[in-house]
UniProtKB/Swiss-Prot annotation:
GO terms for cellular component: cytoplasm; excinuclease repair complex. It comes from the Bacteria. This is UvrABC system protein C. Interacts with UvrB in an incision complex. Residues 16-94 form the GIY-YIG domain. Residues 204-239 form the UVR domain. NCBIfam families: uvrC. Keywords: Cytoplasm, DNA damage, DNA excision, DNA repair, Excision nuclease, SOS response. InterPro entries: GIY-YIG_endonuc, GIY-YIG_endonuc_sf, GIY-YIG_UvrC_Cho, Hlx-hairpin-Hlx_DNA-bd_motif, RuvA_2-like, UVR_dom, UVR_dom_sf, UvrABC_protein_C.
Length: 610
């Protein structure tokens, strides 16, 4: 019998100071983390005789213990609360699902700076521009930059070992700073200066400078140079025509739209830097049942801006579609401390800010509606599959597939679905070794052993295990898994998915461990769910296989050369920029690689020419 928490005795020990509290259930699992300006006052509110919130009632009924940490200020409490939420992922807290850092454009502090995509902590010396909504937006910008400002994008190791310009120089995508005779340090620094201004949003300043350069070149009858400057000017103006610019020029701000319905919330963030819209992203936090919209919005705001704060730029202005219920000053102070400058919230914007907020709210509502419709489709498919397999519930499914080319570079994949669809953070790949090439049974056996031999949490035990294969694959999989499910509280249903002779979608044969075969109509929602998880598993396996095969083939040409071991192979590929670059290198260039003598360079050169 669960022991009732003695709230009266506990509250007598609680201070009126600010701090953080952690609530535990009977299994000593943290189920809620909160902060308070006055701990005693806040914790007492949970144990009043009349509590309106159903969520609070459910939370209190599960409390077995409460730990309290006192802090000096409410700001400290806010940051500590965030750290605890991230550490424990409590059941009753609103949780930020997407905790990935945003990508930036990085301009290195090298003598000849390199421009590249960067994600993560800002530890390298250089300048960071962004954030951008996703890596695709960064790559698109880098591609554009190559055409207008041909600053190098190659790795420093490749740059350091070049004696002649690469293909990027030949097609006008790099100025060629790796070779001193191609461009001077002064001219390259000027080019980098234009790029820096462009990334800072100072397009007009760049245009003024380029127009001046074009006019001077024309006056000096340097018509080729003038034409080059003219092309740069035209390219920048085309970019300006395509890009929406804020009336609040040079301003950095995030605009947060919000929508919540049917247990799904969406916060859409529009990112504006230097007055330009860099892009946007929708977030769908994980919400405990019966959580009100205000708590969702407040919790998301603090978690979002305090997560990865070393890699995330907090803008000076944050536009919100509603007031915060929490202490606004404390949150602003905490974010200002992290950002290193004053951060302000605005909840009743006008002018262009108001239009941005309306746009962000519209996007939040649209994304939420799409999510709800997707969830309804997923729910229908899960119900159909439960009916087909006569199961009471399906909380978790896993699917396995094998990928290789003629037995080479074998990879196994495992993908996971729950009632909301794919759980991509739990996808896994297994590098298969020590088997006969092409032996799919052995590969599947090895993958399943590595997956299930270790102790599993109860919630990680699947209700269904799909095997992408026929009877032989399924039987082998069953032989492996029965060795481990003796201590499991439930036995997964195992289903094989055979593609059939024509391998056309909709004609799959489904096989049980008893050897029974059955088919589902091509329009059956249950079949669509099975096809979805099968395709996810196949794509995950083949992506891993292709990466492994590419890496293997990159080094295989060097493996038969006497005197070239793993370390030297790695050095050769690293310092020349890849196998194709190595094949084009001269003996003298190969000899410049650390650890490679001139005589060995000649052997390598001759071997690669055969």
């Amino acid at each position: 019998m669960t022991q009732i928490f003695d709230s009266v005795s506990f509250l007598k020990t609680v201070t009126h100071q600010p701090g953080v509290y952690r609530m535990y259930n009977a299994e000593a699992v943290v189920i809620y983390v909160g902060k308070a300006k006055d701990l005693k006052k806040r914790l007492s509110s949970y144990f009043r005789k009349k509590v309106d919130s159903e969520k609070t009632k459910a939370l209190v009924s599960n409390i077995a213990k409460i730990d309290v940490t006192v802090t000096h200020t409410e700001t400290e409490a806010l940051i500590l609360e965030h750290n605890y939420i991230k550490q424990y992922l409590p059941k009753y807290n609103v949780l930020l699902r997407d905790d990935k850092s945003y990508p930036y454009i990085f301009l290195s502090a090298h003598r000849h700076p390199r421009v590249s995509l960067h994600r993560g902590a800002k530890k390298r010396k250089g300048e960071y521009f962004g954030p951008y909504p996703d890596s695709g937006a960064v790559r698109e910008t880098l591609h554009l930059i190559q055409k207008i400002f041909p600053v190098r994008q190659c790795e420093d190791t490749v740059y350091a070992n070049r004696t002649r310009p690469c293909l990027m120089y030949q097609i006008g995508r790099c100025a060629g700073p790796c070779v001193s005779s191609v461009i001077s340090d002064v001219d390259y620094a000027e080019l980098v200066g234009y790029l820096r201004l462009f990334l800072q949003g100072k397009d007009n300043q760049v245009l003024e400078l380029l127009v001046q350069k074009m006019e001077i070149a024309s006056q000096q009858l340097k018509f080729e140079d003038a034409a080059k400057f003219r092309d740069q000017i035209q390219a920048i103006r085309r970019v300006q025509e395509q890009q929406y610019v804020s009336e609040d020029s040079q301003e950095d701000m995030d605009v947060l739209g919000f929508a919540q319905e049917n247990g799904i919330a969406c916060i859409h963030i529009l990112m504006i830097r230097q007055g330009k819209v860099l892009g946007s992203r929708s977030h769908f936090p994980k919400i405990p049942q019966n959580t009100n919209a205000q708590e969702v919005f407040d919790s998301f705001l603090t978690q979002y801006y305090l997560s990865h704060n070393e890699a995330r730029t907090i803008p000076s202005r944050i536009i919100l579609n509603q007031e915060l219920a929490a202490d606004v000053e404390a949150i602003q102070l905490a974010l200002s401390d992290v950002a290193g400058r004053k951060v302000q919230f605005h909840t009743s914007p006008s002018g262009s800010r108001g239009r941005y907020l309306k746009l962000s709210n519209t996007n939040a509502l649209t994304a939420m509606t799409t999510k709800i419709n997707h969830k309804m489709t997923i729910n229908q498919r899960f119900k159909a599959l439960r009916d087909v397999l006569a199961m009471d519930s399906i909380a978790r499914m896993e699917c396995f597939d094998i990928s290789h080319t003629m037995g080479e570079s074998t990879i196994a994949s495992c993908v996971v679905f729950n009632s909301e669809g794919p759980v991509k953070q739990e996808y896994r790949r297994y590098n298969i070794t020590g088997i006969t090439g092409g032996d799919d049974y052995a590969a599947m056996g090895q993958a399943l052993e590595r997956r299930y031999a270790k102790q599993l949490d109860v919630e990680k035990i699947p209700d269904i295990i799909f095997i992408d294969g026929g009877k032989g694959q399924l039987n082998r999989a069953h032989e492996i898994i029965v060795q481990y499910w003796g201590d499991w509280p439930k036995r997964p249903v195992m289903i094989g998915i055979a593609k059939g002779v024509t391998r056309k979608p909709g004609l799959e044969t489904l096989i049980t461990v008893d050897g029974d075969e059955f088919h589902l109509p091509s329009d059956d929602p249950a079949l669509h769910l099975i096809q979805h998880i099968r395709d996810e598993s196949h794509n995950h396996a083949i992506a891993g296989h292709r990466a492994k095969r590419g890496k293997t083939r990159k080094t295989s040409a060097l493996e038969g050369i006497e005197g070239v071991g793993p370390k030297r192979r790695q050095a050769l590929l690293k310092y020349t920029g890849g196998l194709q670059e190595l094949k084009r290198a001269s003996v003298e260039e190969i000899a410049k690689v650390p650890g490679i003598s001139h005589s060995l360079a000649e052997i390598i050169y001759q071997a690669l020419k055969q």
